[in-house]
Amino acid sequence: MVSKLSHLQVELLGALLESGLTKETLIKGLSEAEPYVLQSESQHAINALQTEKGESCPEIPNLPNGMGETRLSEDETSDDGEEFTPPIMKELENLSPEEAAHQKAVVERLLQEDPWRVAKMVKSYLQQHNIPQREVVDTTGLNQSHLSQHLNKGTPMKTQKRAALYTWYVRKQREVAQQFTHAGQGILTEEPMGDDLPTKKGRRNRFKWGPASQQILFQAYERQKNPSKEEREALVEECNRAECIQRGVSPSQAQGLGSNLVTEVRVYNWFANRRKEEAFRHKLAMDNFSGPQPTSAPPLTPHNSSSLQPPPALSPTKVHGVRYNQQPASEAESSSSNHHGNSSMVTTQTILHQVSPPGLEPSQNLLSTDTKLISAPGGTLPPVSTLTALHSLEQNPHALGQQTQNLIMASLPGVMAIGAGETSSLAPRFTNTGGSTLVIGLTSTQPQSVPVINSMGSSLTTLQPVQFSQQLHPSYQQPLMQQVQSHINQSPFMATMAQIQNPHALYGPKSEVAQYTHTGLLPQTMVITDTANLSALTNLTPTKQAFTSDSETHTDSGIHTPVSQAPAIHLQNQDTAIQHLQSGPRLTPSPAVSSSSLVLYQSSDSTNSHSQLLPSTHNVIETFISTQMASSTQ
């Protein structure tokens, strides 16, 4: 090192001073450039600068580690504005000269390496020995957040702070090595180097389970949630052995783990805490499972679920029975056959359960088997449950606690037909051979867009509107036996496609579907079929249907049904199998009756009579007709 500045160096210093820098700034910058240069070199440079300017400067005192005292910038000062002096630097004074020289040499070597690589090495050492960062912060005086960012993300850190961190790292390595070396002698404390340090805080490290011990304990918990004392002691030995192997020492030196030594009490507490956590999670799961969820419902489909809304065109002005309101309940008695067994009914209700609106109470479910018929201006109307679960209706003489509300229903008078796709009139266009087809006639004569629910399997998969603009022009002067020569050009089809998972769960196959007359009762229809039949909904070809009225009729199949004094409606299909609908006591189903049968529905003006839901044979469809329709056919 030259003792005299060259002409170029003098010019450079003069240019720096002329640029506005002060003498103190230059001295501090020169000191920060190389904080760990030898004192003689740093002092010679500063003395040369002062000699050039003709000023004198007091010498910087030497530290025990041979480093020059530096003046820190603002970000290196403490929170109260004082200069930052790492406590660990003062602790070096208590070391022997040989130990201090050794640590200084190792620290200087680490400072010359990549800071990010050294940071990862320090972090790995902390994890290996389960050392918390709090211990580093207490010893070095570094900021907790700054230290964490430097170790995890490589955030830059001042050289002097890194020197303090590396000094702690070197000293900790020596302490841990001494602990495991003299573990069997019992002469060492947890912090052998910290008791005599003036800045050491009297705070021991908290016990922390290592990853190796946790893996062993969780495996043991799967086998036995409440181990015995002998089993816990065996786990203690196994955990301590794993911790020693993790640290790279012999299992016989387990006492060197210090505060991380696993004991039987700690194992007992760990199992007790796990049992409490499991019981708490089980309680939460039971509360969530059994708790009421009035506003939640399973989504119909991952797509198009928001389209499940009543058709906007189905207003009370056009269809007087679309939405049910609070009306006086009329008790109804119904009989239906259930020859398919309970398992079929469960399958059907499971498939159709998602159709129920989420806001309905349990007594307002669309599939409720004890739902009563609701009185409406157009006559006594069957609820939706009678359309979806006909053979599950049971007699309930008690009045309803809560009447069904907000049920989307076909306006009556009208006709509902239920038959399989394998029919004489539907087979040419419908491709569904195993499912069921449900047609509900309505009174609206205006074209409108209605929703179509496509059900595949046990969940609703699509929901889309279908527009049917063609209309059927009623002619009440035409005879009832007149056949429609063109397609049934109904206005909107309220189509709900529900392919039953079990083809025989609700409605069995029928040879044909009853044929409807051109009476203006079927301008609006709801059809339940599968996806392949959607394109054929507007091309249905009607056949004939006869309505007669007498006091007593015998069917060709030998079924005899007595009729009361009240007028009755008869529906005849091409097989001349006639079912009678009357007002009277409940009828017993015939042995030949199945769940997919024809039913006529009629309401009477008598307050003592009850509407009947009658079973029939396979060849007849189920039809609901109100009193107005009955009077019009007489």
Curated annotation (Swiss-Prot):
InterPro entries: HD (IPR001356), HNF-1 (IPR039066), HNF-1_N (IPR006899), HNF-1_POU (IPR044869), HNF1_dimer_N_dom_sf (IPR023219), HNF1a_C (IPR006898), HNF1b_C (IPR006897), HNF_P1 (IPR044866). PROSITE patterns: HNF_P1 (PS51937), HOMEOBOX_1 (PS00027), HOMEOBOX_2 (PS50071), POU_4 (PS51936). The keyword Glycosyltransferase does not apply. Residues 133-135, 146-152, 158-161, 206-209, 266-268, 273-276 are annotated as: Interaction with DNA. Residues 1-31 are annotated as: Dimerization. One of its GO terms (cellular component) is nucleus. Expressed in liver and in oviduct. GO terms for biological process: glucose homeostasis; insulin secretion; liver development; pancreas development; positive regulation of DNA-templated transcription; regulation of transcription by RNA polymerase II. Keywords: Activator, DNA-binding, Homeobox, Nucleus, Repressor, Transcription, Transcription regulation. SMART domains: HOX (SM00389). Its main location: nucleus. One of its GO terms (molecular function) is RNA polymerase II cis-regulatory region sequence-specific DNA binding. Residues 50-85, 287-319 are annotated as: Disordered. It comes from the Eukaryota. Residues 202-282 bind DNA. A motif (Nuclear localization signal) lies at residues 200-208. It is found in: Nucleus. Pfam families: HNF-1_N, HNF-1A_C, HNF-1B_C. Signal peptide: none annotated. PANTHER family: HEPATOCYTE NUCLEAR FACTOR 1, HEPATOCYTE NUCLEAR FACTOR 1-ALPHA. This is Hepatocyte nuclear factor 1-alpha. It comes from Gallus gallus.
